[in-house]
């Protein structure tokens, strides 16, 4: 027997629960399906547990630096990994349970646990239950890519999910992948006391960023004793006495990296391969992402895709914004579009990188004339007071429209300070209006007006 609903939401990640709330408030009868843990990647294996680990690692780092601030410890810093893991697990469990309780107590919402599979464009099966609805919303997230590398099937390896279960500090952690996830874990475990090597296939770390940002990130990590190998074109694995042998050169006989543990952090893939999307006629791109239009509708009327599975943004905040876009178009008569989104994001190493808008390379690729200004964090009083002076700020602007095109803040508080620029871009505020702002002293953000005053023409060549 088929159960009929006004809407079906598949997945309880960042977009699904909030959308369910809006739909039920509007009077709809909604079925929400979750096959695993409530809260999605962010709550369970992403932002929340990892940033809890970042905080623990920062505490260890600051304790070791205590003498720099006149604080002398009587004994070396000791890492209690069981306590570290327990703390992260508690934060995760509380958040996940909060989402689950919210949904289960939501009037008009029926929660079903199990794997969803399409039977047609209006029908979804969950175990023995067959559901139907004129509106279906897919919010199934993604998972770590396991690359096809020689020897990988002969060794044990970690992903961003399984590494959260460790209750020990690896002797030597080899991180495959030099982008956001890999670098955050690299610094975390280095600060916990592990030897760490980062192996990146590309020519630089955080490959989407400008070379000056990439070089500064590398310098920060190498100062902490993290080994970095870029342009590793021939990565292969074998078992070794310590645990694993990792080769990175194409020439046989080249020195190997001897590690105890391997973390794979080479990217993410969408969880779309077991949904039966073909039975609904839903189109995918070559990488398995669900293709959507500007309002996040798929090629099938009445079906939407939100969050990591649509390939239009791989962040918690973009997934939540997907919910806002769908709700605005469907319920509020507000024609919001994905392309209107001003994308900001952060790399949560210490010091963090806050980013918004275009990189300098992207501006040049478009052949745009632009203004540029850069200032080191040594010019920021707050950074000097904290003795955390690594990094710099950079801003790019259009000389004719006076719009800010993009910015990078790599330094203490950069993940927070970048929001002033993000908001200005979103509000289309000309940069010359920000020049005369009177920011609070002492803060990281107070250098932004000075940064804007320093804008000078740059070549687009």
Predicted regions and their residues:
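A Rossmann-like FAD-binding core segment of flavoenzymes
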Residues: 74, 110-113, 117-125, 193-294, ...
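Conserved beta-strand elements of the Class I
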Residues: 6-8, 31, 174, 304
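Short hydrophobic core segments
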Residues: 8-10, 116, 131-141, 175-176, ...
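Catalytic nucleophile loop
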Residues: 16, 179-182, 319
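Flexible, glycine-rich terminal cap/loop adjacent to redox cofactors
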Residues: 10-36, 41, 48, 52-59, ...
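FAD-site-proximal beta/loop scaffold in flavoenzymes
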Residues: 153-170, 256-332
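Glycine-rich flavin
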Residues: 2-5, 14, 22-28, 33-169, ...
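Glycine-rich dinucleotide-binding loop and its adjacent helix/turn
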Residues: 47, 140-195, 199, 227, ...
């Amino acid at each position: 027997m088929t159960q009929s609903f006004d809407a079906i939401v598949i997945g309880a990640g960042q977009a699904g629960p909030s959308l369910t709330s809006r739909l039920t408030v509007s009077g709809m009868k909604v079925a929400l399906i979750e096959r695993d843990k409530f809260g999605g990647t962010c709550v369970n294996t992403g932002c929340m547990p990892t940033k809890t680990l970042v905080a623990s690692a920062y505490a260890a780092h600051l304790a070791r630096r205590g003498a720099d601030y006149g604080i002398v410890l009587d004994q070396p810093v000791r890492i209690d990994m069981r306590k570290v893991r327990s703390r992260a697990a508690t934060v995760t469990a509380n958040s996940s349970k909060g989402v689950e309780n919210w949904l289960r107590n939501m009037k008009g919402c029926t929660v079903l646990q199990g794997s969803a599979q399409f039977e047609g464009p209006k029908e979804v099966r969950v175990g023995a239950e067959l559901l139907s609805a004129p509106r279906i919303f897919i919010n199934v997230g993604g998972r770590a890519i396991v690359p096809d590398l020689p020897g990988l099937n002969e060794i044990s390896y970690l992903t961003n999910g399984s590494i959260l279960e460790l209750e020990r500090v690896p002797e030597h952690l080899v991180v495959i992948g030099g982008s956001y996830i890999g670098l955050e874990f690299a610094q975390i475990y280095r600060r916990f006391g592990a030897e760490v090597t980062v192996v990146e296939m590309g020519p630089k770390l955080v490959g989407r960023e400008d070379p000056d940002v990439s070089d500064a990130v590398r310098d920060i990590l190498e100062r902490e004793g993290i080994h970095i190998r870029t342009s590793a074109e021939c990565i292969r694995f074998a078992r070794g006495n310590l645990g694993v042998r990792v080769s990175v050169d194409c020439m046989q006989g080249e020195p190997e990296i001897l590690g105890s543990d391997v973390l794979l952090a080479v990217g993410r893939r969408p969880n779309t391969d077991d949904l039966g999307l073909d039975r609904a006629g839903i189109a995918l791109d070559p990488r398995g992402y669900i293709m959507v239009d500007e309002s996040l509708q798929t090629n099938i009327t009445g079906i939407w895709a939100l969050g990591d599975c649509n390939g239009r943004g791989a962040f918690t905040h973009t997934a939540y914004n997907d919910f806002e876009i769908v709700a605005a178009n469907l319920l509020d008569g507000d024609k919001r579009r994905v392309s209107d989104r001003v994308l900001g994001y952060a790399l949560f190493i210490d010091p963090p990188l806050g980013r918004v808008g275009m990189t300098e390379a992207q501006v040049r690729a478009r052949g745009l004339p632009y203004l540029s200004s850069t200032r080191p964090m040594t010019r920021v009083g707050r950074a000097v007071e904290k003795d955390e002076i690594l990094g710099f700020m950079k801003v790019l602007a259009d000389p004719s429209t006076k719009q800010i095109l993009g910015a990078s803040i790599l330094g203490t508080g950069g993940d927070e300070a970048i929001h002033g620029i993000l908001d200005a871009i979103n509000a289309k505020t000309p940069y010359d209006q920000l020049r005369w702002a009177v920011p609070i002293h002492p803060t990281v953000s107070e250098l932004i007006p000075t940064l804007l005053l320093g804008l000078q023409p740059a070549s687009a060549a």
